[in-house]
Amino acid sequence: MPAPTALKGLDQTTTAGVPVTQAAIVQDDEVLIDAQTSAEESVPVLAPLGENAQDTDMRIDEEGRPVFTPAKDTNTVYRVETRKVPVPPHRFSPLKASWSRIYPPLVEHLKLQVRMNIKSRAVELRTSKFTTDTGALQKGEDFVKAFTLGFDVDDAIALLRLDDLYIRSFEIRDVKASLHGEHLSRAIGRIAGKDGKLKHSIENATRTRIVLADQKIHLLGGYRNILVAQEAVVSLILGSPPGKVYGNLRKVASRMKERF
């Protein structure tokens, strides 16, 4: 009879105890989760999956900031977006007359779908599957809106070709609220000048376009150019002599030529 403390007895007790614990785990597998087995099962899931997994890996630079790989262009889901630009009554007839010059830039350059809705008196824009520029719809809306404000088609097309052009609108009474009746008419006349010469002089000196629509003034051009033109128009509204304003414009024009 071997001693109770023999090594053979210890091996039998240990081997006899192992199946019991495994059986208990198998019976209670819905409640008990072994940490070691779960870690082993999760290893294949977290393993890198070739090149695709390397693209999504996050690396950390020397300063401790995360560095991600550049995103790749993927085929996104096509979604239709629409815009509706209302047309004022006094600009609907010019819109019909110039429609053959308005829709080609929108269709050929921006790849948009355009429709002139006569019933609702609006121009409807919609993206298509050929539209590649994300800002095409906004550019098309700005182009049509510029025409409805009174700008020529050739001037409005510049909004499609250049990205640094803006439109700024304000009313004469925003500058001087006390203008009424004949005083308001004289202020408008000072801005236009005789036969529109002063307005053209401001446009040529500042490289902008100005539209006088009753009591509203619309400016089209670059940011700094609009500020210079607006300052000249405000000076005329406040009563400055046209000669003084024109002299200041000549100085500003010479400075702008030296800058560019």
From Swiss-Prot:
Q: Where in the cell is it found?
A: Cytoplasm; Nucleus, Nucleolus
UniProt GO BP? endonucleolytic cleavage in ITS1 to separate SSU-rRNA from 5.8S rRNA and LSU-rRNA from tricistronic rRNA transcript (SSU-rRNA, 5.8S rRNA, LSU-rRNA); endonucleolytic cleavage to generate mature 5'-end of SSU-rRNA from (SSU-rRNA, 5.8S rRNA, LSU-rRNA); proteasome assembly; ribosomal small subunit export from nucleus; ribosome assembly
**Which is one GO molecular function term here?**
rRNA primary transcript binding
GO CC terms on record? cytoplasm; nucleolus
Q: Which InterPro entries match?
A: KH-I_PNO1_first, KH_dom_type_1_sf, KH_PNO1_2nd
Sections of the chain in a coiled coil: none
Q: What is its main location?
A: cytoplasm
Which keywords does this chain's UniProt record carry? Cytoplasm, Nucleus, Ribosome biogenesis, RNA-binding
* Domain called KH: residue spans: 181-233
Q: What does this protein do?
A: Required for small ribosomal subunit (SSU) synthesis. Has a role in the processing of early nucleolar and late cytoplasmic pre-RNA species.
Belongs to which family?
Answer: Belongs to the PNO1 family.
Its quaternary organisation is: Component of the small ribosomal subunit, ribosomal RNA processing complex (SSU RRP complex).
Please give the name of this protein. Answer: Pre-rRNA-processing protein pno1
Q: Which organism is it from?
A: Aspergillus oryzae (strain ATCC 42149 / RIB 40)
